[in-house]
A protein has these predicted regions:
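NAD(P)-dependent short-chain dehydrogenase/reductase
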Residues: 150-211, 217-218
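Mid/C-terminal beta-alpha module of Rossmann-like enzyme folds, strongest
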Residues: 222-277, 315-318
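NAD(P)H-binding glycine-rich loop region in Rossmannoid oxidoreductase-like domains
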Residues: 47-91, 101
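Conserved Rossmann-fold NAD(P)-dependent oxidoreductase catalytic core, especially the SDR/UDP-sugar
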Residues: 96-132
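Conserved C-terminal active-site "lid" loop/helix of NAD(P)H-dependent oxidoreductases
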Residues: 216, 244-250, 268-305, 317-318
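Active-site Tyr-X1-5-Lys
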Residues: 132-162
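Glycine-rich Rossmann NAD(P)(H)-binding loop
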Residues: 6, 201-210, 235-242, 295
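N-terminal Rossmann NAD(P)H-binding glycine-rich loop of SDR-like oxidoreductase domains
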Residues: 1-23
């Protein structure tokens, strides 16, 4: 199988490449934009600007992949808010170019989406719940999903992820370890507690207080399963257990044997609140993902199992 991956130097993409390398039946092509990978590159690299839809189409036609996993995404919400046309080209237009090109060459298309297609106000959502995004990022992801589902002749899977943590194997120093209004705070908490430093857990206002934290390697394995799955649809590839921010922090302390007293709930940083004053944040994300588990043949990690697996991955790097 010839597998084309975007975002291969990111958290999810590097984990997909790492898993695909272990298989003898996968030839890897990875698009590149920005810093070059720091690990040994034993696969094809294709320089590509996602904002150039014609370049996207030309790349897929050139490589004729059997499957494409589109992980690349803009993640700076403040920047996107102020540069909407640029973000739209790199997200919505790029997605449509990938999807149309995959339909043209007969490739299966896997698009990595987000729990932020929802507003965070419903008590429970599923793969079948209608999206209701509250910020520009979530709106673009929802538009991408709709464009994919409306394209005739396309074999596709939409894999939603949330609160991603783990190792960036391609460019380790790019790993985000900052506090966040969203739910990707696991790496931040581990980094602080491992140094014996206080980990401030923002409790509001304006935080994603509850979500399904997702280990990148676990999500990557589910996305690879989605490549080989023959059903079209939306699939939840995030962690199987929801938790709020403080519950997550204390589970981390339990698994890694850190000092719980260093976990300090605190109001959201007013400077960050001002920066995000025009960006709404989904508050509470809880999902039923049984349809995805049945289709893909297994459940994703629960919170403790995911953290234990991450602890083992960190130990293997020493």
């Amino acid at each position: 199988m010839r597998l084309y991956i975007t975002g291969g130097t990111g958290l999810v993409g590097s984990n997909i490449i790492r898993l695909a390398r272990r298989r003898n039946d996968i030839e890897i092509i990875a698009s590149q934009y920005g810093p070059a990978p720091e690990w040994q590159v034993d696969y094809q690299l294709d320089p590509l600007d996602m904002a150039d839809a014609d370049a996207v189409r030309a790349s897929i036609r050139r490589y004729q992949p059997d499957a494409v996993i589109h992980c690349a995404a803009m993640l700076d919400h403040v920047y996107m808010q102020h540069h909407r046309a640029e973000a739209w080209r790199a997200t919505v237009d790029a997605n449509l170019a990938f999807a149309q090109s995959c339909a043209e060459v007969g490739a299966r298309y896997i698009f990595v989406s987000s729990d932020w297609v929802f507003d965070g106000q419903e008590p429970l959502v599923s793969e079948e719940s209608p999206p209701n995004p509250v910020n520009f990022y979530g709106f673009m992801k929802a538009v991408c999903e709709r464009d994919i589902m409306g394209l005739p002749g396309l074999s596709y899977g939409i894999g939603r992820m949330a609160g991603i943590y783990g190792l960036n194997y391609a460019i380790p120093h790019l790993l985000m370890k900052d506090n966040h209004l969203g739910f990707p705070i696991t790496n931040y908490i581990i980094d602080r507690l491992s140094q014996g430093l206080i980990a401030e857990i923002w409790t509001g206002p304006k935080v994603n207080d509850m979500a399904h934290a997702s280990l990148a390697s676990d999500g990557a394995e589910l996305l690879l399963r989605l490549v080989e799955h023959d059903e079209n649809g939306i699939f939840h590839c995030w962690g199987s257990e929801p938790a709020n921010r403080l519950e997550l922090a204390h589970k981390i302390a339990d698994v890694f044997e850190f000092d719980h007293s260093l976990i300090v709930p605190t109001p959201t940083d007013p400077i960050v609140l001002d920066e995000f004053r025009h960006v709404r944040i989904p508050f509470r994300m809880v999902a039923n993902s049984e349809l995805s588990y049945k289709a893909l043949g297994r459940r994703s990690y629960n919170l403790v199992d995911g953290l234990r697996a991450f602890k083992a991955e960190l130990a293997a790097q020493l």
